[in-house]
Amino acid sequence: MSLEVFEKLEAKVQQAIDTITLLQMEIEELKEKNNSLTQEVQSAQHQREELERENNFLKEQQSGWQERLQALLGRMEEV
C-alpha cells in the first residue's frame, strides 16, 4: 500500500473513532436525561396518588357535612 492510501485509511479510522466517541457521549447524556425524566414521572405519580387520597377524604367529609345539614334541616322542619 502506498503511504497516501494508508493516510486516507488512518484518517477514516480516526473519523470513525471520533464519531463513536461523540455518539457514546450523546448516549450517556440521553441516559441521564431518561433517568431524570423517570424520576419526574415517579414524583408526579406519587403526587397524583396523594391528591387522589386527599380528594377522597374531602369528598367523605363533604358527604358527612351534607348528611348533618340534611338532618338539621329536617329537625327545623319538624319545629
Swiss-Prot record:
**Record keyword Transmembrane helix present:** no
Gene Ontology BP, a term:
division septum assembly
Q: Name the coiled-coil region(s).
A: 3-79
InterPro entries xrefs: Cell_div_ZapB (IPR009252)
Q: Where in the cell is it found?
A: Cytoplasm
User: Which cellular components does GO assign to this protein?
Assistant: cytoplasm
Tell whether Cell cycle is among the UniProt keywords: yes
Keywords in UniProt for this one?
Cell cycle, Cell division, Coiled coil, Cytoplasm, Septation
Q: What is its main location?
A: cytoplasm
Top-rank taxon of the source lineage equals Bacteria
A Pfam family the protein falls into: ZapB
Q: What does the subunit section of this Swiss-Prot or TrEMBL entry state?
A: Homodimer. The ends of the coiled-coil dimer bind to each other, forming polymers. Interacts with FtsZ.
Which family does the record assign? Belongs to the ZapB family.
Q: Which HAMAP family match?
A: ZapB
- Kindly give the NCBIfam families that the UniProt entry links to this protein: PRK15422.1
Q: What does this protein do?
A: Non-essential, abundant cell division factor that is required for proper Z-ring formation. It is recruited early to the divisome by direct interaction with FtsZ, stimulating Z-ring assembly and thereby promoting cell division earlier in the cell cycle. Its recruitment to the Z-ring requires functional FtsA or ZipA.
- Name by which UniProt lists this protein: Cell division protein ZapB
